[in-house]
Regions:
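C-terminal alpha-helical interaction appendages
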Residues: 1-63
Length: 63
């Protein structure tokens, strides 16, 4: 998954809250990091997206 696709999926799933979610929400599925921290640490967007979907119970049709 490309980074642009990741951000598109975030926007569809979380709308205007996607940016603050990425900046401030700490996910146990991402090793106790935020989305931005995980990306900065070199994690792949696809793995991050899977963690976000699991944590926030994103509906299957949006995954």
């Amino acid at each position: 998954m490309r980074l642009t696709e990741f951000w598109q999926r975030m926007a569809v799933a979380f709308g205007p809250h996607s940016e603050s979610l990425a900046e401030y929400h700490v996910f146990s599925q991402l090793g106790g990091r935020t989305i931005r921290q995980a990306l900065a640490d070199g994690e792949q967007p696809k793995g991050i997206w899977r963690g976000v979907c699991e944590a926030l119970e994103v509906p299957a049709h949006q995954r």
